[in-house]
């Protein structure tokens, strides 16, 4: 009886494993980015409570000018920042979402000399570095999402 039960459990575990692995094969991969189309990245920032405005001020002072330089160079098409209109549960909370639309995927992933841009924009590097370090110290979490658009009208 015990041997039969073990065989039954083993068979059930094997069947469950096969189903799980088969289902993973059916999961649809995101579409590959079109090299000719704009590429969207979203950056989420969650600050420590009470530091939302301070983070926003430092972002606008020290990081947004770098992004504007990249817009002027044609690498980035647009930059937008959003904040939730209502509160969320703490675990899911984020304070700011920055959406950057790059010219294309290559522009998004080709490294640039951001340090050269920062040197040109911020001659007082000691202050700039201190403020940027503080901007990240007041963050509780930060994550990036590459977005893939799905054409709903295609079959």
Protein language model annotation of sequence segments:
Residues 1-7:
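N-terminal secretory signal peptides that target proteins for export/translocation
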Residues 35-50:
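Acidic/histidine-rich, surface-exposed loop or edge segments in extracytoplasmic proteins
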Residues 23-27:
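Sec/Tat signal peptide C-region and signal peptidase I cleavage site
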Residues 30-34, 65, 69-77, 91-93, ...:
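An amphipathic, aromatic/His-enriched active-site/gating alpha helix that lines ligand/cofactor pockets
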Residues 48-91:
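N-terminal, post-signal-peptide region of Sec/Tat-exported proteins
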Residues 11-22:
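Bacterial N-terminal signal peptides
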Residues 5, 12, 59, 63:
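Short amphipathic alpha-helical/adjacent loop interface patches that line ligand
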Residues 28, 40-41, 80-85:
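Short structured motifs
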């Amino acid at each position: 009886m015990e041997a039969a039960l073990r065989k039954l459990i083993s068979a059930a575990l094997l069947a469950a494993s096969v189903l799980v692995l088969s289902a993973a094969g059916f999961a649809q991969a995101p579409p590959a980015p079109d090299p000719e189309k704009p590429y969207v990245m979203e950056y989420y920032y969650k600050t420590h409570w009470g530091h939302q405005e301070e983070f926003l001020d430092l972002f606008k002072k020290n990081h947004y000018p770098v992004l504007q330089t990249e817009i002027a160079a044609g690498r980035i098409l647009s930059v937008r920042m959003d904040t939730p209109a209502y509160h969320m549960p703490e675990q899911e909370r984020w304070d700011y979402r920055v959406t950057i639309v790059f010219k294309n995927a290559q522009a998004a992933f080709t490294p640039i000399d951001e340090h050269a841009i920062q040197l040109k924009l911020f001659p007082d590097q000691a202050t700039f570095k201190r403020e940027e370090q503080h901007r990240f110290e007041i963050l509780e979490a930060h994550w990036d999402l590459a977005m893939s658009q799905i054409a709903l009208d295609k079959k």
